[in-house]
């Protein structure tokens, strides 16, 4: 019967008929029923049944190739985007930034970066065995391009833990402070952006801004100010400008992990007020600054405000991932990345007291504070209209080198 059925099927095919004879259809149905029955049977020990597994199960058995393919494809796409951006930059074309959406920012902020940074801070303070110090520090030096010939102590065995290594001191002659210009760089780093502050918006990187008032917070109490405040009806920018004919300027310096982590006074000025903003600790590298609007307003930061010979002056140290610890040498009450402080609040401290009517005087180049790893310094200050920056965006700069002058 099977043979005749097979012949009937062959005759049908040879005859060019597009239908199958009933015996062939019967065999096909029976075969499918038999295979379906096998799939429903439980697997027995020592019996392999891979030939009856559905396609869905085969993919579940191989997640690694799928993840590698997906991740590789995304990485390739990102590399193509970077290559395209570099080509456009070489042609002199401006590349509009691609900002993160609200849900992307919220998702990133939900990552426990403060907790992770506290854990990293404690890990950095663990004393390393003497024999392990050289290989660990050498790996860090090689990875981030640290120049140890500038360090006051070049012997790697001298640094008991990573925290001491990050905060290493420099040789006195390693960073001469420029005396010809009125404003010098407070730290080593990379210039992200600089220029005049217009319409109460500050440029984070080219094409991405943040609110001046959100960044600095509301004006301090009038008794803390060394100069009378402007009318409350003025814009926030105009409230900071104290002298007619002056402008408000800004400069953003990004400190990479391999840079010198201390920061110094950029000019001769008097600090009258400190404001601490607990916040997130998102990465502040230039790529993230191009992606997240008002990144510096989201992150934890310490704002020092006061005055210099031309009016208002401020220096802000912005925290980042694994950089929850910001230290100001003369402020022992400051405790950053502390679980007792909640996001969205701020803590004020006035350095103007009955015993000290002026505040804390700082000389240009004098040590001011330090990070435990790379981060960002933002300068916002008042100066006459003929103030000129001697910079270009993206350039590397070292502590003590000129930022600008009149």
UniProtKB/Swiss-Prot annotation:
Where is this chain primarily localised?
Answer: mitochondrion
Record-annotated disulphide pairs: none
- Provide the phenotype resulting from gene inactivation: Mutant embryos die in utero between 8 and 10 dpc. They exhibit large numbers of aberrantly shaped mitochondria. In mutant embryonic fibroblasts, fragmented, rounded mitochondria of irregular diameter are widely dispersed throughout the cell rather than being concentrated around the nucleus.
In its record, the post-translational modification comment is: Is synthesized initially as an inactive proenzyme. Formation of the active enzyme involves a self-maturation process in which the active site pyruvoyl group is generated from an internal serine residue via an autocatalytic post-translational modification. Two non-identical subunits are generated from the proenzyme in this reaction, and the pyruvate is formed at the N-terminus of the alpha chain, which is derived from the carboxyl end of the proenzyme.
Q: Does the keyword Lipid biosynthesis apply?
A: yes
**Which UniProt keywords are given for this protein, alphabetically ordered?**
Cytoplasm, Decarboxylase, Lipid biosynthesis, Lipid droplet, Lipid metabolism, Lyase, Membrane, Mitochondrion, Mitochondrion inner membrane, Phospholipid biosynthesis, Phospholipid metabolism, Pyruvate, Transit peptide, Transmembrane, Transmembrane helix, Zymogen
Q: Active-site residues?
A: 188 (charge relay system), 264 (charge relay system), 375 (charge relay system), 375 (schiff-base intermediate with substrate)
GO term, biological process aspect, one: lipid droplet formation
Q: In which tissues is it expressed?
A: Widely expressed, with highest levels in testis, including Sertoli cells, followed by liver.
Q: Where are the Mitochondrial intermembrane topological domains?
A: 80-406
Q: Where in the cell is it found?
A: Mitochondrion inner membrane; Lipid droplet
User: Per the record, where is site Cleavage (non-hydrolytic)?
Assistant: 374-375
Q: What is its EC number?
A: 4.1.1.65
Q: Give the pathway.
A: Phospholipid metabolism; phosphatidylethanolamine biosynthesis
Q: What sections of the protein cross the membrane?
A: 61-79
Reactions catalysed: a 1,2-diacyl-sn-glycero-3-phospho-L-serine + H(+) = a 1,2-diacyl-sn-glycero-3-phosphoethanolamine + CO2
Q: List Pyruvic acid (Ser) occurrences by residue.
A: 375
User: Could you give the subunit structure recorded for this chain?
Assistant: Heterodimer of a large membrane-associated beta subunit and a small pyruvoyl-containing alpha subunit.
What family is it from?
A: Belongs to the phosphatidylserine decarboxylase family. PSD-B subfamily. Eukaryotic type I sub-subfamily.
User: What name has this protein been given in UniProt?
Assistant: Phosphatidylserine decarboxylase proenzyme, mitochondrial
Record the organism: Mus musculus
């Amino acid at each position: 019967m099977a043979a005749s059925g097979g012949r009937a099927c062959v005759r049908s095919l040879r005859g060019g008929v597009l239908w199958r004879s009933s015996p062939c259809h019967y065999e096909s149905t029976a075969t499918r029923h038999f295979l379906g029955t096998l799939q429903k049977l439980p697997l027995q020990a020592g019996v392999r049944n891979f030939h009856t597994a559905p396609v869905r199960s085969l993919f579940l058995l191989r997640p690694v190739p799928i993840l590698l393919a997906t991740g590789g494809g995304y990485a390739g796409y990102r590399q193509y985007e970077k290559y395209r951006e570099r080509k456009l930059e070489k042609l002199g074309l401006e590349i509009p930034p691609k900002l993160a959406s609200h849900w992307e920012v919220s998702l990133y902020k939900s990552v426990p970066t403060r907790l992770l940074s506290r854990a990293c801070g404690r890990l950095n303070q663990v004393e390393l065995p003497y024999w392990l110090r050289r290989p660990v520090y050498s790996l860090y030096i090689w990875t981030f391009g640290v120049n140890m010939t500038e360090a006051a102590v070049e012997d790697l065995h001298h640094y008991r833990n990573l925290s001491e290594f990050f905060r290493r001191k420099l040789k006195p002659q390693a960073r001469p402070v420029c005396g010809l210009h009125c404003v010098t760089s407070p730290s080593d780093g990379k210039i992200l952006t600089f220029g005049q502050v217009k319409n109460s918006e500050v440029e984070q990187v080219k094409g991405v801004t943040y609110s001046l008032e959100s960044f600095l917070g509301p004006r301090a109490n009038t008794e803390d100010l060394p100069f009378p405040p402007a009318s409350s009806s003025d814009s926030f920018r105009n409230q900071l400008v104290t002298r007619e004919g002056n402008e408000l300027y800004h400069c953003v310096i990004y400190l990479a992990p391999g840079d010198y982590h201390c920061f110094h006074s950029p000019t001769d000025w008097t600090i009258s007020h400190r404001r601490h903003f607990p916040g997130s600790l998102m990465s502040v590298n230039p790529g993230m600054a191009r992606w997240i609007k008002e990144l510096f307003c989201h992150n934890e930061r310490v704002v020092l405000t006061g005055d210099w010979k031309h009016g208002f002056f401020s220096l802000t140290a912005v925290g980042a991932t694994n950089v929850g610890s910001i230290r100001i040498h003369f402020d022992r009450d400051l405790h950053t990345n502390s679980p007792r402080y909640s996001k969205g609040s701020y803590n004020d401290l006035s350095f103007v007291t009955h015993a000290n009517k002026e505040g804390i005087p700082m000389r240009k180049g004098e040590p001011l504070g330090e990070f435990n790893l790379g981060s960002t310094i933002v300068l916002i200050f008042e100066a006459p209209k003929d103030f000129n920056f001697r910079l270009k965006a993206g350039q590397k700069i070292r502590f003590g080198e000129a930022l600008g002058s009149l």
